[in-house]
Amino acid sequence: MNKVVLYCRPGFEKECAAEITDKAARREVFGFARVKENAGYVVFECYQPDDADKLVRELPFSSLIFARQMFVAGELLRDLPPEDRISPISGMLQGVVEKGGDLRVEVADTNESKELMKFCRKLTVPLRAALREVGVLTNYETPKRPVVHVFFIAPGCCYTGYSYTTNNSPFYMGIPRLRFPSDAPSRSTLKLEEAFHVFIPADEWDERLANGMHAVDLGACPGGWTYQLVKRNMWVASVDNGPMAQSLMDTGQVTWLREDGFRYRPTRNNITWMVCDMVEKPAKVAALMATWLVNGWCRETIFNLKLPMKKRYEEVSQNLAYIQEQLNAQGINAEIQARQLYHDREEVTVHVRRWWAAVGGRRDER
């Protein structure tokens, strides 16, 4: 198996392809990406047969911006016989995967592919039983073993392969299933909720999204992102010239500051979270975020970068590199991650967690 299949948002196949080609080459894995416009996936074909496994093992999935999922795959199975689709799939996986811990029968996130969802659900149970019988799957689900993927791109056509639970998306199709809360002021609230799921391990939520924390929301109106912070019982300074939803103001946890988010400067030094979803050029937002981080005005931040029409991967890479350079210049350690979330559109969401350097009034964190 010498291919890596990557799921992505339809319309962003070129960005996904540019990213995997670039980051694979940095690890001395060379190949070429097969791209079909608006397909919702990319196939990166490695020149060396073992390099696909190397890539899926060693390239941190968390470092990918435009991919929702990645797995090692073999040749495309075509024209599966309607009377027996299971045998060719089972045959393709035998000798490749031994005792996988989970099975995901998936499709791309397109309207055309979604018509196959009912079929995928129907196929999953008998396919799981057949794969257990031949040892491709264990007799019980376990997160300690590889995930077996069967990815249908059309009726009777699928890629088969595997990913590692330590380096993949835990979500079916790479998409967290979130429900829009009826009392939220806007649908943008789902962006921040998804970002929490993607960037913060579930076992760290109680510590890093704790009751009583202080947070700032830049460009907050009408309050979709503030809602997520209030929901976690934080005290929020919501900065925007536009009004906040009255339901949020009634909680008593929100202070509305009628100011421009780019001009606002915090007056307290115990802010844990700063979040920002402003419609502005990405370079301008990146510069503002770097200012907050370098000055130690917050401990963690989640913000959106709106994407241009062309060279979107290059633009995001430049913005992230700028933030990293500003932090490096001050000797500040930080963890930077970016992802085009399911609820994002022409944008990517960035998370930065700062590890405190020597700034007055701060304790050192290692």
From Swiss-Prot:
Q: Where is the active site?
A: K306 (proton acceptor)
Name a GO molecular-function annotation. Answer: S-adenosylmethionine-dependent methyltransferase activity
Short name of any one Pfam family annotated for the protein: FtsJ
Residues binding S-adenosyl-L-methionine: S188, C221, P222, G223, G224, D240, D260, D277
Disulfide partners: none
Q: Does the keyword Cytoplasm feature in the UniProt annotation?
A: yes
Question: What Enzyme Commission number does this protein have?
Answer: 2.1.1.186
Q: Which InterPro entries match?
A: RlmM_FDX, RlmM_THUMP-like, RNA_MeTrfase_FtsJ_dom, rRNA_MeTrfase_M, SAM-dependent_MTases_sf
Instruction: Give the reaction(s) catalysed.
Output: cytidine(2498) in 23S rRNA + S-adenosyl-L-methionine = 2'-O-methylcytidine(2498) in 23S rRNA + S-adenosyl-L-homocysteine + H(+)
Where in or outside the cell?
Answer: Cytoplasm
The biological processes this protein is annotated with in GO are: methylation; rRNA processing
- Give the record's keywords alphabetically: Cytoplasm, Methyltransferase, rRNA processing, S-adenosyl-L-methionine, Transferase
Gene Ontology CC terms, in alphabetical order: cytoplasm
Taxonomy, superkingdom: Bacteria
What the record says about family reads: Belongs to the class I-like SAM-binding methyltransferase superfamily. RNA methyltransferase RlmE family. RlmM subfamily.
Subunit-structure text: Monomer.
Its biological function? Catalyzes the 2'-O-methylation at nucleotide C2498 in 23S rRNA.
Return the protein name.
Answer: Ribosomal RNA large subunit methyltransferase M
- The scientific name of the source species is Enterobacter sp. (strain 638)
Gene it is expressed from: rlmM
